[in-house]
């Protein structure tokens, strides 16, 4: 299921420093027409990071699959695996929570992870919505994540084993 995939993938990846692990995948494979995204990702130097699974908004109406609070950026993550969005405005609702509750003073990225064609379609349907003027919408396909694992900088046999297990 989606939750198992999210838990296993990010539960493992969080043991690698952000700058050598997840950010390598994002810098090489995340897609956005927003020109600021590449600049934001290339400027991140965080090592340790928290991954908050299934974080809920204060009113409980919005739940996102993952949230990563970094020093200068908040990254919301919506994972789709063989299922569409729960509603046409799901990403908008998540973006508003990023903007107003979780990281009002930081840059905000909302990362959609899905099958390549589905991710591209959902991105196109949402990218011009008003909230994405303040929240940077980005997508990443599961196919590219698999390729991106080759970009991870590993410093020990233990880290190599973790990445191999993810493949």
What are these regions (language model features)?
Residues 1-167:
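Charged, terminal alpha-helix-loop-beta segments
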């Amino acid at each position: 299921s989606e939750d198992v995939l999210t838990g296993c993938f990010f539960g493992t990846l969080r043991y690698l420093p952000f700058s050598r692990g997840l950010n390598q995948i994002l810098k090489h494979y995340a897609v956005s027409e927003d020109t600021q995204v590449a600049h934001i990702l290339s400027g991140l130097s965080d090592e340790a990071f928290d991954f908050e699974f299934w974080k809920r908004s204060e009113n409980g109406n919005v739940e996102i699959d993952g949230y990563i609070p970094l020093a200068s950026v908040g990254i919301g993550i919506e994972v789709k695996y063989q299922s569409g969005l729960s509603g046409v405005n799901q990403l908008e609702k998540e973006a508003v929570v990023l903007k107003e509750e979780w990281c009002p003073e930081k840059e905000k990225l909302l990362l959609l992870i899905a099958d390549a064609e589905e991710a591209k379609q959902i991105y196109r349907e949402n990218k011009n919505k008003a909230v994405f003027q303040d929240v940077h919408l980005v997508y990443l396909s599961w196919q590219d994540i698999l390729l991106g694992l080759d970009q991870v900088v590993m410093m020990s046999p233990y880290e190599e084993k973790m990445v191999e297990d993810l493949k």
